[in-house]
C-alpha cells in the first residue's frame, strides 16, 4: 500500500499550476512584463493570494519530499539539502514582496529557490533508474534552457518562469512515481 505522504505533491501540482497560471493570465501586461512575484506585489489581495499558494503548495510538496522521496532515494542527504533550498526559498519569497527596498532580497531568495529546483532535477536524474532517470534528464535540460532564456530575455521572463516552475513540479512527481 502506498503511504499517504505520496499524494500531497500531486495535489500541490494541481493547485500550483491552476493558481499561478490564473495569476499570470489575469494580471500580465504585455507592455510592462513582470515576474510572478512582481505581479503579486502590485496589489495586497494578489500578494495574499500568492502567499497562500506558495505556503500551501510548498508545504504539500515538503510532505512528499521529506517523508516519501528522501527516505527511498539514492543520495538522500543531497536530495534533502536541494529540497530544503527550494522550500526555504519558496517560503521566504512569500514573506518578502518583490518591490521597493525588499526587491534585491526577494531576487536573492528567488535565485536560491531556482538553484534548489534545478539541483533537485539533476539529482533525481542521477538517483533514479531507467526511464525515470531519463525523464529527469529531459526535465533538467529543459529547465536549464529556461534558466538561460530567463537570464537573456527579461521581457518574456514570465513565459519562461512558469514552465520552469511546472517542470520542477513534474520532476518531483516523476521521482515520487519512480519510488512508489
Feature-to-residue mapping (PLM):
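Small-residue-rich segments of transmembrane alpha-helices in multi-pass membrane proteins
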Residues: 42-45, 108-122, 164-178
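N-terminal topogenic module of multi-pass integral membrane proteins
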Residues: 1-68
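C-terminal ends of transmembrane alpha-helices
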Residues: 23-31, 88-103, 142-159, 177
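Membrane-proximal helix-loop-helix units in multi-pass membrane proteins
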Residues: 83-132
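Short juxtamembrane and helix-loop transition motifs at transmembrane-helix boundaries
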Residues: 37-47, 67-75, 94-102, 122-130, ...
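Transmembrane helix-loop-helix
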Residues: 63-87, 124-145
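Hydrophobic core of alpha-helical transmembrane segments in multi-pass integral membrane proteins
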Residues: 11-22, 62-65, 120, 135-150
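Terminal transmembrane helical module of multi-pass membrane proteins
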Residues: 125-180
Amino acid at each position: 500500500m502506498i503511504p499517504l505522504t505520496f499524494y500531497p505533491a500531486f495535489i500541490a501540482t494541481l493547485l500550483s499550476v491552476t493558481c499561478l497560471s490564473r495569476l499570470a493570465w489575469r494580471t500580465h501586461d504585455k507592455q510592462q512584463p513582470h515576474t510572478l512575484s512582481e505581479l503579486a506585489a502590485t496589489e495586497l489581495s494578489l500578494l495574499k493570494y500568492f502567499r497562500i499558494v506558495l505556503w500551501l503548495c510548498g508545504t504539500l510538496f515538503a510532505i512528499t519530499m521529506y517523508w516519501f522521496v528522501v527516505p527511498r532515494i539514492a543520495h538522500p542527504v543531497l536530495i534533502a539539502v536541494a529540497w530544503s533550498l527550494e522550500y526555504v526559498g519558496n517560503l521566504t519569497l512569500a514573506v518578502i514582496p518583490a518591490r521597493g527596498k525588499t526587491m534585491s532580497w526577494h531576487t536573492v531568495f528567488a535565485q536560491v529557490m531556482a538553484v534548489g529546483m534545478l539541483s533537485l532535477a539533476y539529482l533525481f536524474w542521477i538517483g533514479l533508474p531507467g526511464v525515470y532517470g531519463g525523464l529527469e534528464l529531459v526535465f533538467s535540460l529543459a529547465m536549464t534552457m529556461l534558466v538561460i532564456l530567463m537570464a537573456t530575455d527579461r521581457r518574456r521572463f514570465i513565459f519562461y518562469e512558469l514552465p520552469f516552475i511546472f517542470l520542477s513540479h513534474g520532476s518531483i512527481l516523476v521521482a515520487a512515481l519512480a519510488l512508489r
